[in-house]
Regions:
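Polysaccharide-binding and catalytic clefts of secreted carbohydrate-active enzymes
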Residues: 1-151, 158-160
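Substrate-binding cleft of secreted/luminal carbohydrate-active enzymes
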Residues: 138-256
Length: 256
């Protein structure tokens, strides 16, 4: 499957594009329950240099979908292995794109909720960010080695907070997501944070034009750009004027 996707990227890179961005480059959204295949078991055992006698129980009990209070012997090492798998694919994908056209920018989309993004098998932070210092319950000392920010030309962070949690300093506020993102990325890559204006709490039925300028303000002033998920929602709920208002306010602020 990896080779198939890499060939798709090579074919795509032959076109005159400004950039290529990967989405859903992660483990399935069943999170911790995804991919206990024979090949994953084999690759994991090769990685740790040991045989896992009780698989998957020595990693996690079947049905585990959140951080267990009592962790089996290989639980944290399994999380490390998963982020290595995604890290290594990102490196291959970038190399494949650049081998065809070195001028194409290469990036990814990720959810900004880093504190629980280990369930998706992704460490999008800089390898300079020592994850285990801040999240010792689930990150090994080597987890940081598989941060892939330094392999990207840009990254989109989904700051997908609810309509009433735009400003703030922690996760699950748009502003907080972007502020945390800057710390996590350590300057390795420019990033754009932005809201989900069609699916997050309070956004699903439209009618939130008044909130759009604040969402733009919170994200664009705490990151290196702005993006919104998704264009179809802007059109569906006729948010065009609201977006123009938000961007005009930003442009006025940087001209002062």
């Amino acid at each position: 499957m990896q080779n198939f996707v890499l060939q798709l990227l090579a074919d795509l890179a032959k076109y005159d594009l400004d950039g290529i961005i990967l989405d859903r480059c992660r483990y399935d959204d069943y999170g911790l329950e995804s991919d206990f295949s024979d090949i994953s078991k084999q690759k994991f055992e090769e990685y740790i240099g040991e045989t896992v006698a009780n698989f998957p129980a020595d990693i996690m009990a079947p049905g585990t979908d959140e951080l267990p209070s009592e962790q089996p012997a290989y639980f944290k090492k399994w999380l490390e292995f998963r982020v290595k798998v995604i890290h290594d694919f990102i490196v291959k994908a970038r190399d494949k794109v650049k081998s065809v056209n070195n001028n194409i920018k290469f990036g990814v989309y990720v959810g900004a909720w880093y504190s629980t993004y280990y369930t998706s098998g992704v460490n999008w932070a800089s390898p300079k960010y020592n994850t285990s210092t801040y999240y010792p319950k689930w990150a090994t000392a080597d987890y940081k080695n598989y941060g892939y920010a330094d392999h990207l030309d840009y990254i989109f962070l989904g700051a997908y907070a609810s309509v009433n949690n735009i400003y703030g300093s922690g996760e699950w506020t748009m502003e907080g997501f972007c502020k945390n993102g800057r710390e996590l990325l350590q300057g390795d890559v420019p990033f754009a944070g932005g809201p989900d204006i069609g699916n997050s709490t309070g956004w699903t039925d439209g009618g939130q034009s008044a909130k759009i300028p604040d969402a733009i303000d919170a994200c664009i002033n705490n990151s290196d750009g702005f993006f919104a998920f998704d264009l179809c929602h802007i059109k569906m709920y006729d948010y065009w004027n609201a977006f123009k208002t938000g961007f005009d306010k930003y442009l006025e602020s940087i001209e002062e």
